[in-house]
Amino acid sequence: MDAQLNNLWEQALNIIKGEISEISFNTWIKSCTPISISDNILKLSVPNEFTKGILDTRYKDLLIQALKIVTSRKFKIEFYLESDLEEEKENEEKQKEEKKDNTNDVDGSIVVSDEMSATLNPKYTFQSFVIGNSNRFAHAASLAVAESPAKAYNPLFIYGGVGLGKTHLMHAIGHYILQENPKAKVVYVSSEKFTNELINAIKDDKNEEFRNKYRKVDVLLIDDIQFIAGKERTQEEFFHTFNALHEENKQIILSSDRPPKEIPTLEDRLRSRFEWGLIADIQPPDFETRMAILKKKADVEGLSVPNEVMVYIATKIKSNIRELEGALIRIIAYSSLTNRDVSVDLASEALKDIISNKESAPVTVKTIQESVANYYNLRIEDLKSQRRTRNIAYPRQIAMYLSRKLTDMSLPKIGEEFGGRDHTTVIHAYEKISENLKTDEGLQSMINDITKKLTQK
């Protein structure tokens, strides 16, 4: 933003600040970033479609009026989504790269740091990452890799559910490395984009340029690597890319929604390489972490939210960070649109659709038995029977473990639900599964899947 545009925008903000409530100003107006001003048109960047709609319908005239007071001219306001601007920037960079094709060095090497650092989200840094028990290990591993690329863990494989912070950590690694070494060649890309670029390279007979781009870097970060599974040519290309980088002692960081052994149709040779380094998982945040995330979000956005409202959100929204932050913004928006103070009652109204869906059915021993039996293709009667073959006994222990963890039922009562077993049997099952969870990633993934289905029905 140039100085003249910055000065004009700050003056307009000062005028608007006196016209609307603080919460409306912080929620809507401060979310805008001026891009350019020319021909009496001010272009503003906004974070999402929802914000764009609110600004367009409720605050556009106010912005125009403020600009008129500052400049004595009537401006038009145009809103652009940040995601669209990023895509446009990527396309421009791609066109520039194509124009440089004939002027590259003889060895075909290309400088990617400046170009690729533009694809890193500036908000995703280690400083803005909220650490809790659910992500402490993944955060520590990511920081270790950022501090000593290719010396700590190579590759680093981060896995976890949607919205838990995998992408945040990957961007944070990229930012940290570039901050310490601005000349480092850092590439961040989704597996989908990697695949699409490969397809285009094959189609346009530019395989060598594609390989130079991804094999002559210092750090390669690939998000959602699970999506290359089943794509034979992509797996072949990535296999050789992985080998080339690893042999040159370059850092590789991968993310996925599941551990390598759980990715179906992934070639064994890739699976084994993904397991060469360190595998770190991220679990759904616990209550304390959810509270910390909400407080951090409120501080960053300049929002005033009563503590009891944050407690309410953290108690009701348990699945992931994205939903937590979305719930907070929804409450603030509801407060602004209804011109009411933020309170627990207002929060309950704003989130009634979301929360009613999440609280529709309580978890019971019966629903746990149904889920486990369905997962293992058994009958509930099998779990209650006296049979002790491993294909039945182990699922039974898992069901007992989940029954103790997810319900308030006493141990003797749980035992009764499993064919009249003694409470010590339930304790043994719980302890055995708890111990196995420490080392068995497949079991961790399965328990998480079943728990998610049970708690989000």
From Swiss-Prot:
Domain of life assignment: Bacteria
Q: Where is this region: Domain I, interacts with DnaA modulators?
A: 1-75
Listed GO MF terms:
ATP binding; ATP hydrolysis activity; DNA replication origin binding; lipid binding
Q: Where is this region: Domain III, AAA+ region?
A: 119-335
Q: Answer whether the UniProt record assigns the keyword Cytoplasm to this protein.
A: yes
Keyword Iron assigned to the entry: answer is: no
Annotated region (Domain II), positions in chain: 75-118
Compositional bias of kind Basic and acidic residues: 91-103
- Binding positions for ATP? 163, 165-167
- Name the segments for region: Domain IV, binds dsDNA: 336-457
Q: Name one Pfam family in it.
A: Bac_DnaA_C
Where in the cell?
Cytoplasm
Name any Gene Ontology BP term: DNA replication initiation
User: Known InterPro entries for this protein?
Assistant: AAA+_ATPase, Chromosome_initiator_DnaA, Chromosome_initiator_DnaA-like, Chromosome_initiator_DnaA_CS, DnaA_C, DnaA_dom, DnaA_N_dom, DnaA_N_sf
What segment(s) does the record annotate as region Disordered? 87-108
> Keywords assigned by UniProt?
ATP-binding, Cytoplasm, DNA replication, DNA-binding, Lipid-binding, Nucleotide-binding
Domain comment in the entry: Domain I is involved in oligomerization and binding regulators, domain II is flexibile and of varying length in different bacteria, domain III forms the AAA+ region, while domain IV binds dsDNA.
Q: What does this protein do?
A: Plays an essential role in the initiation and regulation of chromosomal replication. ATP-DnaA binds to the origin of replication (oriC) to initiate formation of the DNA replication initiation complex once per cell cycle. Binds the DnaA box (a 9 base pair repeat at the origin) and separates the double-stranded (ds)DNA. Forms a right-handed helical filament on oriC DNA; dsDNA binds to the exterior of the filament while single-stranded (ss)DNA is stabiized in the filament's interior.
Family note: Belongs to the DnaA family.
Subunit structure, briefly?
Oligomerizes as a right-handed, spiral filament on DNA at oriC.
What is the protein's name according to its record? Answer: Chromosomal replication initiator protein DnaA
